[in-house]
Amino acid sequence: PAKPPYSYIALITMAILQSPHKRLTLSGICAFISGRFPYYRRKFPAWQNSIRHNLSLNDCFVKIPREPGHPGKGNYWSLDPASQDMFDNGSFLRRRKRFKR
């Protein structure tokens, strides 16, 4: 399968926006991406590290700690409210501008 034309930021944003609570764990984000794009089913470890790196590096993603009493691994990730419209008209191919918190 061919590599999708989307940046990692776009892939992460797609995953978060489709989730019911608009937040996902790293594993939830990776599950969405590999489920939607066959290209990412093969090279799992390498691109998962890129997803992790992009979550930590970009201000448009916000880490949300797990609530006490909710077992599981890892924090949740969501979009900073000010960055919700960073993709023009829902097109994930182009970002409007860099987002800074």
From Swiss-Prot:
Pfam families: Forkhead. CDD domains: FH_FOXD4-like. This is Forkhead box protein D4. Its main location: nucleus. SUPFAM superfamilies: Winged helix' DNA-binding domain (SSF46785). The gene is Foxd4. PROSITE patterns: FORK_HEAD_1, FORK_HEAD_2, FORK_HEAD_3. GO terms for cellular component: nucleus. It is found in: Nucleus. It comes from Rattus norvegicus.
